[in-house]
Amino acid sequence: MVEIKYQVTATNSFGSYEFDVNEDLAQIELNLTTSLKPWYHLFVIHEGKQVGQILITHKQNARQVLIGKTVATSSATVFPSLSLVGHWEIKFFASQIDAEIEELTISRTDHLNAPLVDGESQQDVVHELASNLNKTGWLKGDFHTHTIYSDGMMTRQANLESAKNQALDFFVTTEHNVVTALWPRQDEVAVYGGCELTTPFGHTNFLGIDRPLLDATGMPGFVDEQALMAVIEANQGNGIMSINHPFLDPWAWTLDVPLAYVSSMELINDPTYRDNDAATIKAFDLWSALWNHGWQITGIGGSDSHLLPDDKYPDADMPSLIGDPATYVFVETLTRDNVLVGIKAKHTKVSRFGEINLVSQDKGDILPGEQLTTNVRNFELQLPATTPAGYLTEWILDGTVVATSTDLTSTYTITSDIDLNDYHWLRADVKDQNGVQQATFTPVFWGHRQPTITTYQEVLVND
């Protein structure tokens, strides 16, 4: 065994451990120990190619990392390598350093034979894409989840069990800055690769990715706005970008990103977290402003689940669960690419209490996000029987509440004095007794509006 200790400070937060492997090992085992407070980002590089990432947060002070030739002998955030012979480098940087000196210890054990097995590493969900061609239409998912490989409390298997209990068809795994790529193999819930880019300027998800967001050659990649923008630009086309909890302090989104980069926005984030009621209301107001400016951003939800299923936050009256809220996406069949197509097409509904349904007597079933003809003016929103008593449906036309109802089935008609040849949009929000949105759908619309603003901060300044 080889053991190396590094002293890390706020002004010296970067380091690198290099070594060579000259024989045909079955596995390299790393054991990392740290002081508890900082976050450590580590990048595993083999012969100049990044093959893995590791995150140690304030929730851990130790992590075992298996670097193997197969999925089964590799840790969740490390892709297997055909051969381990060659030059290796473990680059790292620390953030959130409070003490004058922190310490990181890296211990390395080389296994020539009999590699250790990670019992939950069975399928590479980034490259071996899950699909279920028998699932079609409106499917239930979650776009914001965490495990023990960032700051969550659940294992991969526990996440899957919780998702099954919540009747999810799919979810995206979105650790902070790393990709949890290796998962247990099962057929009930599709798991797709993602990553929550976690920065001093807010958090944003990249959903349905085919490679990690961060490249160690540009480490750390987000310490200033210019570097963060470079990371975002480099990942255009690597899944889709979705801004997370835009008004949830201290993780609110502040970077003045071009809106052309953003496909969707998280409207409802973990509704059991104490500060999210106010943040949710602000997110919906921003969503209306974006649509009024002609930026038709898709609305989604994310549980941001960090806790065990039986745990809850202080002052919360219910546990924080994966699938709360759920996002329903209309797909041809369940594949990763079809889910992304559904988001880009704006065919989404978000709900905490069951699936809602939008119809029109002028057209029949309507897909959220659909551009409608001028003769479609009559709408009906159907809420499930599981809707809590006292919830209020608000119909919103161009950002203004135009009708309300407390019935499970509510209707709205656009009057003839409104010219639907012009640009208009319509959605309905379902609110609880405190006026906080619990369900919605991405608006339907008419006409076209060319945006005159181009960046995120411009919307905040102008509305």
Predicted regions and their residues:
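Charged catalytic cores and adjacent phosphate/nucleic-acid-binding surfaces used
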Residues: Y6-V8, V44-I45, Q64-L66, D110, ...
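Noncatalytic modules at the cell exterior or secretory-pathway interfaces
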Residues: A26-L30, V78-E102, D422-R427
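Extracellular and analogous surface-interaction loops
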Residues: S16-A26, T77-L84, T373-T374, I418-L420
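A metal-dependent hydrolase metal-coordination microenvironment
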Residues: V126, S131-A260, L267-W287, G302-S305, ...
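Beta-sandwich interaction modules
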Residues: Q60-W88, S95, T413-I418
